[in-house]
UniProtKB/Swiss-Prot annotation:
The modification N-acetylserine is found at S2. Disulfide bonds: none annotated. Interacts with ARL3. Gene3D superfamilies: 1.20.5.170. It comes from Saccharomyces cerevisiae (strain ATCC 204508 / S288c). Coiled coil: none annotated. The modification Phosphoserine is found at S10. The gene is SLO1. GO terms for biological process: intracellular protein transport. Residues 1-34 are annotated as: Disordered. This is SCOCO-like protein 1.
């Protein structure tokens, strides 16, 4: 018997098929887990991006409303000064 045959425990020098299948299943499971994690991260990023866009729109709308109110209050203040003189 050669040293290779002794070290692997099989007469052909190859790993038994059950060990190969186990290794392939573990690799497949790791790949599947990584794919699920990647998809979850991508979905989370998409949700965060959409929420950011929504908040930017709300912020812009509030800024426009503030500008309008500033103009309105400024006009009221000017008109009240005219009446006092």
């Amino acid at each position: 018997m050669s040293a290779e045959n002794i070290s692997t425990g099989s007469p052909t020098g190859k790993q038994p098929s059950s060990e190969v299948n186990l290794g392939e299943r573990e690799a497949g499971t790791k790949n599947e887990r990584m794919m699920r994690q990647t998809k979850l991260l991508k979905d989370t990023l998409d949700l965060l991006w959409n929420k950011t866009l929504e908040q930017q729109e709300v912020c812009e709308q509030l800024k426009q409303e503030n500008d309008y109110l500033e103009d309105y209050i400024g006009n009221l203040m000017r008109s009240s000064n005219v009446l006092e003189k």
